[in-house]
């Protein structure tokens, strides 16, 4: 899996006023947990853009004044009005412990139903996955090359190697729906067949 490096600094002052001052200085307060102790830190807001505003999933290398931590983005809080990042939580990861992440789904192939005029609907964009860090996939490929109009692919059709998908097996991932034009064409063809 791809990794993004975040450079941060340990926080000396904790509390609302200190956090507010950090945000005014375009810094984002955060907490690293999952290791021996919680580490409070802050990082420039601009550094977080590639991690937060993307559909991709990443591992994070957190560099706190020379100390390196491998982690993942666990939680993020946004301002309710202007979508500014208010706070981030990072979870430290270890090679011998499984982690849970939301991994994006990538549709692979061309659905014959789309060629016939159907509409491909991507029902799920991400799935929660549990795996050891070395086995965590960048994306979950889903083959749609066999989907005709009215057919769908489900979570149960995904071949997961070395990871577990946390979703109901019957959950639809992608479906080729009938469009109005396709229904109208079918009704028109049926009407012509009855007139003969």
From Swiss-Prot:
InterPro entries hit by this protein: Rbsml_bL25/Gln-tRNA_synth_N, Ribosomal_bL25/Gln-tRNA_synth, Ribosomal_bL25_b-dom, Ribosomal_bL25_C, Ribosomal_bL25_long, Ribosomal_L25_dom, Ribosomal_uL5_bac-type
SUPFAM superfamilies according to UniProt: Ribosomal protein L25-like
A molecular function (GO) term: 5S rRNA binding
Database matches in CDD domains: Ribosomal_L25_TL5_CTC
Biological process, per Gene Ontology: translation
Entry superkingdom: Bacteria
Listed GO CC annotations: cytosolic large ribosomal subunit
Keyword rRNA-binding included in the entry's annotation: yes
Keywords carried by this UniProt record: Ribonucleoprotein, Ribosomal protein, RNA-binding, rRNA-binding
Quaternary data: Part of the 50S ribosomal subunit; part of the 5S rRNA/L5/L18/L25 subcomplex. Contacts the 5S rRNA. Binds to the 5S rRNA independently of L5 and L18.
Similarity annotation: Belongs to the bacterial ribosomal protein bL25 family. CTC subfamily.
Role of this protein: This is one of the proteins that binds to the 5S RNA in the ribosome where it forms part of the central protuberance.
Protein's name according to its UniProt entry: Large ribosomal subunit protein bL25
Species this chain originates from: Amoebophilus asiaticus (strain 5a2)
Gene name for this UniProt entry: rplY
């Amino acid at each position: 899996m791809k990794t993004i490096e975040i450079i941060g600094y340990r926080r000396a002052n904790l509390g609302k006023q200190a956090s507010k001052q950090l945000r005014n200085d375009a810094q984002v307060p955060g907490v690293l947990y999952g290791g021996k102790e919680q580490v409070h830190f802050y990082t420039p807001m601009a550094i977080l853009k590639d991690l937060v505003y993307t559909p991709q999933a990443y591992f994070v290398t957190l560099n706190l004044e020379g100390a390196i931590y491998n982690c993942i983005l666990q939680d993020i809080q946004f301002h309710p009005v202007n979508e500014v990042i208010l706070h981030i939580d990072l979870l430290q990861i270890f090679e011998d412990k499984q982690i849970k992440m939301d991994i994006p789904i990538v549709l692979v192939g061309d659905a014959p139903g789309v060629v016939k005029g159907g509409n491909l609907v991507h029902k799920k964009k991400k799935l929660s996955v549990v795996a050891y860090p070395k086995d965590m996939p960048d994306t979950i490929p889903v083959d749609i090359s066999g989907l005709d109009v009215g057919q769908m692919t489900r979570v149960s059709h995904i071949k997961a190697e070395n990871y577990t998908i946390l979703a109901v097996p019957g959950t639809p991932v992608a479906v080729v729906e009938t469009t109005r034009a396709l229904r109208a064409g079918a009704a028109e063809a049926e009407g012509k067949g009855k007139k003969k």
